[in-house]
Curated annotation (Swiss-Prot):
Name the record gives this protein: Succinate--CoA ligase [ADP-forming] subunit beta
Gene for this chain: sucC
Residues that bind substrate: N274, G331, I332, M333
Species in which this protein is naturally found: Bartonella quintana (strain Toulouse)
Classification via HAMAP family: Succ_CoA_beta
Keywords assigned: ATP-binding, Ligase, Magnesium, Metal-binding, Nucleotide-binding, Tricarboxylic acid cycle
Cofactor comment text: Binds 1 Mg(2+) ion per subunit.
EC code(s) of this entry: 6.2.1.5
GO cellular component, one term: succinate-CoA ligase complex
The protein's required cofactors: Mg(2+)
GO BP term (any one): tricarboxylic acid cycle
PANTHER family according to UniProt: SUCCINATE--COA LIGASE [GDP-FORMING] SUBUNIT BETA, MITOCHONDRIAL, SUCCINYL-COA SYNTHETASE BETA CHAIN
Length: 398
């Protein structure tokens, strides 16, 4: 689960991280009221959407030469003018796709006298099985680009889960970021704070880009992105309250109601599979034969007929889907249950695109018989390779 920048900053501030004074607003009237209460004279007006690249993004409704989704203002009047131009508009960034995201809230905060911009994040380093700091002097940039072009400029520092962030860890991080005097003292306080927040709140990513050194020599969190482990949210009702459903894909929201692992993608082949590994293999072979999957969907090992029906409805609700591939290896999951769910869903929502079904394992013969006796226009496949080729051929021939 993701949260907005202002929510992330508020959470980090509760742990003691240094942030600017700021307020989230939902209307022009609120913007004027609260901007007057900020010290000024420099303000920053930030679009709040779950996507990066906001500063370089463009609003669909405005001219191409208009400013992006993060703007500076030198007076309350300029703040209000920018809010009028940004609120309710559709912001397109490199992460939103061409459809963009509507800006329903803005964050207004004090400007900062920036001396240097740094990059800092915490994530789970699966190679060593530990939470790790990732830091770089190249703040404000796309860290993926830095990693690809100049990987030597990045330090990855795994943290011992027993000892936590040690003084030696702080020294390495401060040295890597070339922090001195007040900034170094701030860093020695900040790094353990961030690690504590990451672990206590079950985060999967905490990214500060940039972390700035101000001209007075102190550190400040200028931008923050936090993602949480969905499987741990039951422990954090306070975090669940921060969820903004308007920022999430409606299909993914519906899938979560049925305990389905679903991720929307940008392809045209809808996939329904049991097991994450088999689901990824299914997507891989679709790409191998020159097409793109429209989703990742794992119905799990013990799905019911109702769950399978719900999964099928979610796939068919995607207008980009031009064909559907059902790939089931029945171990705990029985092929006849899958077949019953598919048949029930097709009869309820109709079948407007080609459907290929590959079944293998427990009760395979019963499953095939259910589909065969249904009278539906379903293409059977003998194995995964055959299934992938058949669905792609059917879509291209449609």
């Amino acid at each position: 689960m993701n949260i907005h920048e202002y929510q992330a900053k508020r959470l980090l501030h509760e742990y003691g991280a240094p942030i600017a004074n700021g307020v989230a607003v939902y209307s022009i009237e609120q913007a004027e009221k609260w901007a007057k209460k900020l010290p000024g004279p420099l303000y920053v007006v930030k679009s709040q959407i779950h996507a990066g690249g906001r500063g370089k993004g463009k609003f669909k409704e405005l001219d191409l030469d208009s400013k992006g989704g993060v703007r500076l203002a030198k007076s309350v009047e300029e703040v209000v003018a920018n809010v009028k131009e940004m609120l309710g508009k559709t912001l397109v960034t490199k992460q939103t796709g061409p459809e963009g995201k509507q800006v329903n809230r803005l964050y207004i905060e004090d400007g900062a006298d920036i001396e240097r911009e740094l990059y800092l994040s915490l994530l789970v380093d699966r190679a060593v099985g530990r939470v790790a700091f990732v830091v770089s002097m190249e703040g404000g940039m796309d860290i993926e680009t830095v990693a690809e072009e100049t990987p030597e400029k990045i330090l990855t520092l795994p943290v011992d889960p027993v000892q936590g962030v040690t003084s030696a860890d702080c020294k390495r991080l401060c040295d890597a970021l070339e922090l001195h005097d007040n900034a170094r003292k701030d860093g020695e306080k900040l790094f353990p704070i961030l690690y504590k927040a990451f672990c206590e709140k079950d985060m999967s990513l905490l990214e500060i880009n940039p972390l700035i050194v101000m001209k007075d020599g102190h550190l400040r969190v200028l931008d923050a992105k936090i993602s949480f482990d969905n499987n741990a949210l039951f422990r954090h009702p306070d975090i669940l309250e921060l969820r903004d459903l308007s920022e999430e894909d409606p299909k993914e929201i519906e899938a979560s109601k049925h305990d389905l692992a679903y991720v929307a993608l940008e392809g045209t082949i809808g996939c329904m599979v049991n097991g994450a590994g088999l689901a990824m293999a299914t997507m891989d072979i679709i790409k191998l034969y020159g097409a793109e999957p429209a989703n990742f969907l794992d119905v799990g090992g013990g799905a019911s007929k109702e769950k399978v029906t719900a999964a099928f409805k979610i796939i068919t609700a995607d207008p980009n889907v031009k064909g559907i591939l059902v790939n089931i290896f029945g171990g705990i999951m029985r092929c006849d249950v899958i077949a019953e769910g598919v048949v029930a869903a097709v009869r309820e929502v109709g079948l407007k695109v080609p459907l290929v079904v590959r079944l293998e394992g427990t009760n395979i013969e019963q499953g095939k018989a259910i589909i065969s006796d249904s009278g539906l226009n379903v293409i059977s496949a003998s194995d995964l390779d055959d299934a992938a080729q058949k669905i792609i051929a059917a879509v291209r021939g449609a």
